[in-house]
């Protein structure tokens, strides 16, 4: 079993996008399902994942490093789901790219708000 097959089996959304063009290079099966995507060719990450027409104002591309994850939280306005996000600079087919792992914590957030 190769790495892509393993990533496709995860419950977390995992995607890779080109650092310079924002082109969506890969998204795992759970990500495709959550975002309603089939064919990702020529899609920009900001359009496919956030429904935006230009790069996200909260994009972390400029601060990503190869040796550590940048961890943050965000609510996806397209799906209205809340995520813990882990972003990292990687090489994908020889080019710099962004790896993002998104853990959906919406239910946990809803419970926290209801008991607060």
Residue ranges and their predicted role:
Residues 95-116:
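Sensory coupling linkers of modular signal transduction proteins
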Residues 4, 8, 39, 109, ...:
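Signal-transmission coiled-coil "S-helix" linker that connects upstream sensory/regulatory modules
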Residues 31-41:
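PAS/PAS-like sensory domain cap-loop motif
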Residues 34-35, 48, 111:
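Residues that scaffold the ATP/ADP-binding catalytic core of kinase and kinase-like folds
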Residues 47-75:
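Terminal output helix/cap of sensory domains in signal transduction proteins
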Residues 16, 86-89, 102:
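Sensory input modules used in signal transduction
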Residues 65-84, 90-96:
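Per-ARNT-Sim (PAS) sensory domains and their PAS-associated C-terminal
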Residues 1-22, 29:
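Sensory modules in modular signal-transduction proteins
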